[in-house]
Amino acid sequence: MALVTLGINHRTAPVEIRERVAFTPERMAEAFSELRAASGASEAAILSTCNRTELYLAGDDDCAPSVLRWLAGFHELDVADLENVLYVHRDSDAVRHMMRVAAGLDSMVLGEPQILGQLKDAYALAREHSATGSFLSRLFEQTFSVAKRVRTQTAIGENPVSVAYASVSMAHHIFADMSRNKALLIGAGKTIELVARHLAEAGVRSFLVANRTLEKAQALAEAHGGKGILLSEIPDHLSDVDIVISSTASPLPILGKGAVERALKKRKHRPYFMVDIAVPRDIEPEVASLADVYLYTVDDLRQVIEENIRSREGAAREAENLISSGVQDFLDQLRALDAVSTLKVFRQRAELLRDVETEKALRALRNGTDPETALRSLARGLTNKLLHQPSVQVRKAMAEGRTEVTECLRELYQLDALEADEPTTTEKL
């Protein structure tokens, strides 16, 4: 079974490409069905976040070109648009890549924990669509185990830094005393939950949470003494807030330039701080052209995030060692499973030959053959049958100069020990 990973991330592709390659929840069922058909893979999983889209495939090692064409077609892109930003990992490199992603070593924010939850969600979604089998299931479980060891045995998770944390950190550049500011959070997912927590820790006391589902908005808002509203109510409240941070799975922008312009007039040009964490973007890019609006995307957060990376570099080196060990453990598991499978087939073949020769001997006995003659014929026939195919392959290997085959045979049957123990002609006499 070959493992192939294809993807783009914040290092290889700008947000303009990433948002077009992101998978929306509404199209996941369609994506799984088409992906497996296009790739010929027996197992598949899809990870789609604001910073990366990755496809994990178990099956044909040559599926990368067909998957690239499918990915471009599914998102209505030219293949050329993706070729220069797409990376491909195979087999052990793909295993290492997944483990590094899960541990946060490949994230924009080194060591950030959210990606592990997102990877678990991707695995659950693949299982929900019956897209995984024993191979990917074993890989995901091993990956989660390694990520847990990285989290508990290194300092990679200390000094919390994330896209959510970086967003709040940047707000301090605009507002020195954030206790005077009111925040509007658009969305109610895990990232927005983190944003709300960091804003509260930074001193923000007034919250609005807007979401497509009012109940979710209210639940998150009430946890921080705020108010939940529907997305359609945002224009009514926009002029009252100073900070807008958005992270939804909407395929279309939620906040447009016109709505912000009208709110600015009511605010008498008091500044807005906005961060659009979503991919595809929730806030129209044209909003950035407005005076008194400071709009940032996930790519703009890179500088803030890089300042925090240095504190985690030592822990990252320790994490890499744990991951190397995890990769080796997984490969050892696969080899052990392959050995079990091979031995099972080997035994089945031997038992089949035994049954054939036993039936011959029984027929001979029923026909009146002397029992000793029948037994000797059974032993001779079974020996010949068991040794015929290995003998043919050994002769072929020797003719081709592949001496390692005979070395393997000598090791399997301990022939050197047998030769050493065999008595000489004189001893036999």
UniProtKB/Swiss-Prot annotation:
Detail which positions bind NADP(+): G187, A188, G189, K190, T191, I192
EC number(s) of the enzyme?
A: 1.2.1.70
The GO molecular function terms of this record are: glutamyl-tRNA reductase activity; NADP binding
* Marked site: Important for activity: H97
Catalytic residues of the enzyme: C50
Reactions that this protein is recorded to catalyse: (S)-4-amino-5-oxopentanoate + tRNA(Glu) + NADP(+) = L-glutamyl-tRNA(Glu) + NADPH + H(+)
Enzyme category, top tier = oxidoreductase
Family matches, as InterPro entries: 4pyrrol_synth_GluRdtase, 4pyrrol_synth_GluRdtase_dimer, 4pyrrol_synth_GluRdtase_N, GluRdtase_CS, GluRdtase_dimer_dom_sf, GluRdtase_N_sf, NAD(P)-bd_dom_sf, Shikm_DH/Glu-tRNA_Rdtase
Q: What Gene3D superfamilies is this protein classified in?
A: Glutamyl-tRNA reductase, N-terminal domain, NAD(P)-binding Rossmann-like Domain
Q: Which UniProt keywords apply?
A: NADP, Oxidoreductase, Porphyrin biosynthesis
Provide the residue positions that the database annotates as binding substrate.
T49, C50, N51, R52, S107, E112, P113, Q114, Q118
The residues forming the signal peptide are none
Q: Please give the pathway this protein is involved in.
A: Porphyrin-containing compound metabolism; protoporphyrin-IX biosynthesis; 5-aminolevulinate from L-glutamyl-tRNA(Glu): step 1/2
According to its UniProt record, which protein family does this protein belong to? Answer: Belongs to the glutamyl-tRNA reductase family.
Share what the entry says about its subunit structure, partners included: Homodimer.
State its role. Answer: Catalyzes the NADPH-dependent reduction of glutamyl-tRNA(Glu) to glutamate 1-semialdehyde (GSA).
Could you give the domain comment from the record?
Possesses an unusual extended V-shaped dimeric structure with each monomer consisting of three distinct domains arranged along a curved 'spinal' alpha-helix. The N-terminal catalytic domain specifically recognizes the glutamate moiety of the substrate. The second domain is the NADPH-binding domain, and the third C-terminal domain is responsible for dimerization.
Q: Beyond the main fields, what else does the record say?
A: During catalysis, the active site Cys acts as a nucleophile attacking the alpha-carbonyl group of tRNA-bound glutamate with the formation of a thioester intermediate between enzyme and glutamate, and the concomitant release of tRNA(Glu). The thioester intermediate is finally reduced by direct hydride transfer from NADPH, to form the product GSA.
Q: What is this protein called?
A: Glutamyl-tRNA reductase
Q: Which source organism does the UniProt entry give?
A: Marinobacter nauticus (strain ATCC 700491 / DSM 11845 / VT8) (Marinobacter aquaeolei)
Q: What gene codes for this chain?
A: hemA
